[in-house]
């Protein structure tokens, strides 16, 4: 994830530099054609270019705004996941270690149940990350395999759902009938996990309208190809002043601007992809798991 302006500038340069080089080469080619065939290859009226450029700017503005909305929604979803997982683990630590709330009598049994619930929460977070990243064949350690066996988790089904079912079943069996408030509170967190997962899967499985993206890209490319014919050459001071060559960097800058904005919109429009502009899913999930493991360490101490 890009965290500083310096990193952002470096990534921006890596994206825009190829566009600038290609635009410069294209401008040189057009200027060469003008020198060979004359000024009649340029458009005599700039009105067409102005109207077309305004339309392209509107398209790109809407595209960038929509892409950022998707990115921000994804970031809020993972912020909600962080808060829900931390709160859920904290309440497990608090509720399960209250003997009068549980069916279990032995303190060691209660601690083991709390550890298992926190471990299952960590496994759920890891599995949720794997499913969002399409990494369905992630390796499982011995502790995970043990929990899957102890809680009869069917690995042939969707694992994230199976883990939540096991969590809900364990909570239902763990608390005494009089602990309805605690049980209901924890079940609400299970429901929130389902809600968060559904929102994330909606973003992942519903990409930004590809037809609109293709149309915007084609429009931008067409406009970029037209720009040198709209700008023309700059004949201030006469043909021998060489000021006409100012049209080359001018065209390259304008073209790079439009092409870079379109590229940034495409990157931000897929917020769960593995690139530097996407939501840092791995970092967020590792932080959540670390926080949950801290609570587990309190139980062991």
Predicted features by range, described:
Residues 91, 95-212:
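Structured inter-helical modules in multipass membrane proteins
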Residues 79-95:
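Amphipathic, membrane-active segments
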Residues 1-80, 98-102, 237-243, 259-267, ...:
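N-terminal juxtamembrane/topogenic regions of multi-pass membrane proteins
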Residues 25, 55, 193, 219-226:
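Hydrophobic alpha-helical cores of multi-pass transmembrane domains in eukaryotic membrane proteins
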Residues 14-20, 189, 201-232:
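Transmembrane alpha-helical segments and their cytosolic interface motifs
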């Amino acid at each position: 994830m890009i965290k500083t302006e310096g990193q952002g500038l470096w990534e921006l340069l890596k994206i825009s530099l190829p566009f600038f080089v290609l635009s410069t080469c294209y401008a040189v080619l057009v200027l060469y054609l003008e020198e060979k065939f004359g000024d009649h290859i340029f458009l005599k009226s700039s009105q067409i270019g102005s109207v077309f450029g305004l339309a392209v700017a509107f398209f790109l503005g809407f595209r960038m705004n929509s892409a950022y909305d998707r990115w921000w929604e994804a970031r809020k979803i993972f912020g909600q996941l962080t808060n829900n997982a931390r709160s859920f683990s904290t309440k497990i630590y608090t509720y399960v270690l209250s003997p009068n709330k549980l069916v279990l009598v032995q303190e060691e049994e209660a601690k083991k149940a709390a550890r298992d619930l926190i471990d299952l929460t960590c496994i759920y977070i890891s599995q949720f990350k794997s499913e969002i990243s399409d990494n369905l064949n992630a390796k499982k350690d011995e502790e995970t395999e043990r929990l899957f066996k102890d809680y009869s988790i069917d690995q042939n089904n969707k694992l994230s759902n199976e883990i939540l079912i096991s969590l809900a079943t364990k909570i239902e069996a763990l608390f005494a009938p009089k602990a309805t408030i605690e049980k209901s509170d924890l079940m609400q967190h299970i429901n929130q996990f389902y809600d968060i997962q559904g929102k994330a899967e909606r973003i992942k499985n519903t990409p930004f309208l590809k037809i609109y993206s293709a149309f915007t890209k084609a429009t931008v490319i067409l406009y970029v190809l037209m720009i040198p014919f709209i700008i023309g050459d700059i004949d201030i001071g006469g043909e021998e002043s060489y000021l006409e060559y100012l049209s080359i960097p001018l065209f390259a800058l304008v073209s790079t601007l439009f092409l870079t904005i379109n590229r940034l919109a495409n990157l931000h429009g897929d917020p769960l992809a593995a690139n530097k502009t996407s939501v840092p899913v791995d970092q967020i999930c590792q932080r959540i798991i670390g926080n949950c493991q801290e609570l587990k360490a309190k139980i062991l101490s």
